[in-house]
A protein has these predicted regions:
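Mg2+-dependent prenyl diphosphate-binding active-site environment of isoprenoid biosynthetic enzymes
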Residues: 1-218
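Conserved small/polar residues in nucleotide/adenosyl-binding loops
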Residues: 226-230
Length: 230
């Protein structure tokens, strides 16, 4: 089910591209890309349980097809398998990057959950949420690939540039994803649209809508979100 679930595989692709850019000649970059994809897939399995999602990449989600318990357990397995593979890569700095990213991703999910229906959520706080829950794994992908390719860190400026690229790429990715939840087509995207609003998630389109709405429009949106949060 997981291997046939589709998806863009952007995060592992960034690992391979960054390794190629730095002329890495070994084989551990493939294992590193696998680790990144395992971590990402684990977060998706858990997210679908938290969000009670029924559609992912055009297919029925694992929690809908089997059960929440099965999804959580398989997600846990992928996390543990990812860390087992980290040991095989044999780099403490890379393990540090990936373990820290995994921890911050969980913090970001909790931060988002605790702000459902929060009409006062600022754009700055929203950006912090997407940095934690989404962009950090993109950053970890390019940063860890850079360290794998240059373990002595002789190209510090290039390593930092690749790390920043991953971070900014991840932020841009989430901004577009949040916009598509309002403006996209569910058939094209392979997932439901309107879920963020239905779940009371304060994403940038909704934050900006509240900022630019008339008093009547703000009241209507506020009542809807209060009803959802209850």
């Amino acid at each position: 089910y997981i291997t046939e679930a589709g998806g863009k595989r952007l995060r592992p692709l960034l690992v391979l591209l960054a390794s190629k850019e730095l002329n890495y000649e070994g084989k551990k970059h493939v294992k590193l890309a696998t680790i990144i994809e395992f971590l990402h897939t684990a977060t998706l399995l858990h997210d679908d349980v938290v969000d009670d999602s029924s559609l992912r990449r055009g297919k029925i989600t694992a929690n809908s097809k089997w059960s929440n318990a099965a999804s959580v357990l398989v997600g846990d397995f992928l996390y543990s398998r990812a860390f087992e593979l980290m040991v095989d890569v044999g780099s403490l700095p890379i393990m540090g990057i990936l373990s820290k990213a995994t921890n911050i991703i969980a913090e970001g999910e909790v931060l988002q959950l605790s702000n459902l229906g929060n009409l006062d959520l600022s754009e700055q706080k929203y950006r912090e949420i997407i940095r934690c829950k989404t962009a950090l794994l993109f950053e970890a992908a390019t940063h860890s690939a850079a360290l794998l390719s240059c373990p002595d860190e002789t190209e510090k400026e290039l390593l930092d540039d690749l790390r920043k690229f991953g971070l900014h790429f991840g932020v841009a990715y989430q901004l577009i994803d949040d916009w598509l939840d309002y403006a996209g087509d569910s058939g094209t995207m392979g997932k439901n649209t309107g879920d963020d609003l239905a779940e009371g998630k304060m994403t940038l389109p909704l934050i900006l809508a509240l900022q630019n709405a008339t008093e009547r429009e703000q009241a209507c949106l506020s009542l809807s979100l209060i009803h959802i949060s209850e």
